[in-house]
């Protein structure tokens, strides 16, 4: 499954263009612009499955750093500060990674 099966290419392009500069990534505005915030829990779970590159059932810090590349191979990697802030926002149980329920909560926050 491709991310464009769930989200529109136009929305993805718009969301990526808003965070091209280093340290400009904001997960709330990104999720809103890309259209993920308005998706169903099942659709959000499918996006989680795409982001979970190693299929561990969690999005780990290394996968978060490459978050934008899941939307476009030409996108930048997140900075260390962006990655840590993103992880801190999503990791509500403190295990150092984001599970599917945590991701769904983060998207809807």
UniProtKB/Swiss-Prot annotation:
GO terms for molecular function: calcium ion binding. Keywords: Acetylation, Calcium, Metal-binding, Repeat. SMART domains: EFh (SM00054). Ca(2+) 1 binds at residues 52, 54, 56, 63. It holds the Pfam family EF-hand_7. Belongs to the parvalbumin family. This parvalbumin has an isoelectric point of 4.3. This is Parvalbumin, thymic.
């Amino acid at each position: 499954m491709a991310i464009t099966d769930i989200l529109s290419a136009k929305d993805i392009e718009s969301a990526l263009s808003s965070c091209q500069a280093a340290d400009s990534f904001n997960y709330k505005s990104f999720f809103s612009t890309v259209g993920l915030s308005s998706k169903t829990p099942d659709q959000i779970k499918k996006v989680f499955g795409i982001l979970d590159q190693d299929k561990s059932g969690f999005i780990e810090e290394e996968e978060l750093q490459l978050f934008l590349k899941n939307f476009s191979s030409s996108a930048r990697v997140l900075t260390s500060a962006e990655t840590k802030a993103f992880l801190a926002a999503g990791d509500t149980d403190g295990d150092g990674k984001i599970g599917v329920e945590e991701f769904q909560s983060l998207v809807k926050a």
